[in-house]
Every structure is written in C-alpha cells, then in structure tokens.
C-alpha cells in the first residue's frame, strides 16, 4: 500500500472524519446529532476536510451527503487501525 503524506488534522476534523468513516455515508444533520456539534461547526469541518481531499460531498434533494474519500479512508485506517470500516 502506498504511504500517504502526513496530514495535519484538528481534533474536530478527526472526529468528523472518523464518524463519517464509521457510518459509511452521512448527512450534515446526522453528523451534527451524532457528534453533538452545531450544523455550522460540522459544515466548517467538512469544508476543511474537503479542502484536504479527505471527504466527498454530494448534494441531493436539499441534503448534503458526505463520504470519506479513498485518501480519507486510508488516513482513518492509519490513525485507528483497529477500526472496522462500514464499507
């Protein structure tokens, strides 16, 4: 497996990425509830994660659905090797 370059994540970014990876896919409202963060906080973290190419965001029927990108899944496996992904 190709090694990924070190990526700096804040605690909130890491929590959001971990939650998305555990769920396989989630919407902003579900993430907000699951993480006990406001929607604006979640949206801010998602913008940062998308800029780092760790998540993909798809707009459908007024909702934003988020998935971890391949790079994001690799990073989660590196950070939490014991975690079993949902996909």
Model regions: which residues?
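Short, locally clustered residues in the helix-turn-helix/winged-helix DNA-binding domain
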Residues: 18-22, 80
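Short alpha-helical segments that sit at the start of domains
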Residues: 1-16
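Residues within the helices of the helix-turn-helix
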Residues: 18, 29, 47
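Short acidic, hydrophobic short linear motifs in intrinsically disordered regions
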Residues: 25-34
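Short amphipathic alpha-helical interaction segments
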Residues: 36-51
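Amphipathic alpha-helical dimerization/coiled-coil segments
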Residues: 1-2, 73-87
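Minor-groove-contacting beta-hairpin "wing" of winged helix-turn-helix DNA-binding domains
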Residues: 62-70
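A short, conserved structural fragment
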Residues: 50-60
């Amino acid at each position: 497996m190709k090694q990924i370059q070190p990526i700096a994540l804040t605690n909130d970014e890491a929590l959001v990425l971990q939650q998305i990876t555990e769920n396989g896919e989630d919407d902003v409202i579900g993430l907000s509830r699951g993480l006990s963060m406001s929607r604006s906080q979640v949206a801010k973290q998602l913008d940062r994660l998308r800029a780092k190419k760790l998540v993909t965001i798809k707009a459908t029927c007024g909702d934003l659905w988020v998935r971890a990108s391949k790079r994001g899944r690799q990073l989660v496996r590196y950070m939490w090797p014991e975690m079993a992904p949902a996909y």
